């Protein structure tokens, strides 16, 4: 799969204790409705094939608190890949310590890592996932009917609150897509950039 629920949670300004089971089913929907139509099936498959699995058999070691990591090390922490960007002063500095770690785009090929982060594809996918997820965290869908979920530590969001949040994520999704599109079609002779040649499978570059 091109993204994990934990990556979405790590990227967006949402509770880090968010229930991943609410997000995971919506990733397939985003792939079908957002990614494949906009990227084109062949290009999407090329990106997805280049993706490094974060499950069993991943080339990255799982973060170990007792290990003394150094700059350049890559680990898996809560099913998200991180790269050590500065050697911590001692063992035990886990990837939540942003002075020493940053998110690592888990792709084999540099051009896809660049597209994922610099090109904005990561943000596009994350925000689209939330568009599909929010209705199912506001409403509890049961065979007996629908009910509004409540929070023991606050008030449940109103329909207007949900609509406003959905609008925000929709705007963020389209902003991210514009970034993706501009990146994939970018030509800059002064900087020796010709992304249509670098990403020939993108439908607009064919």
Predicted regions, residues:
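Conserved short "hinge" loops at termini or chain/domain junctions
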Residues: 1-65, 70-73, 78, 87-122, ...
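Long, hydrophobic, well-ordered secondary-structure blocks that form the structural core
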Residues: 164-167
